[in-house]
Amino acid sequence: MAHLASSFASYETFLRGADAFWSVDLGAMNNSGVTGDALLSVNTEEDGTRYLNISISAAGLTPDVRHAQHVHGTFDAEGNPSDARMPVIADDADQDGFVEVLEGLAAYGDILLPLTDGDGVLPMTRSDGTMNFIQSYELGDASNFFSPVSGNDYTAADLMPVENREIVLHVQSVGSGFGEGTGGEINGSQDGYVGLLPVAAGEIEGTNRAQALDILED
């Protein structure tokens, strides 16, 4: 059951046999207009192997480009998991009108799990700016858990409790001139595609099978 095709029919099959369920209501960041939701579920195979399956559906994204997306998480001073949150405009330290990726770090934390397909490829949006993504990750495979930004390695234990974690989507087209004289990815020199800029985020919340199936159907 773990190695499912990347389709909503296959994910429905996974949900019906899953042990735990979570959902995410993705909210727009940086005036992107992005909307969407995500589902997460865990299934335990007969041999004890556990898989995390994640589906993301989003609209309002920059069309026809690959979008980075991750599960992020924060830790306290002792290294214990803390509650990540969606950044707000008050996190815009350089006051250029954009909460850039590093400015949001205190809110959502480091990348714990990059959300790519089985070949490590980022998902591509359609020409209408929509995206659907489904992928399974073996929780016992530590190679799944790392940050391409900080270089830190993580494990599935760092992902827990899942309710403390955040999903963040990136990539926006931003015209030249915005943020001129400031640092970060919006510094006035950009002209179009900005791969790092966060465009949507949402806190992971617990749900149940019936609600998860309803979200999938919608």
Model-derived features with residue positions:
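N-terminal leader/targeting pre-sequences
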Residues: 1-216
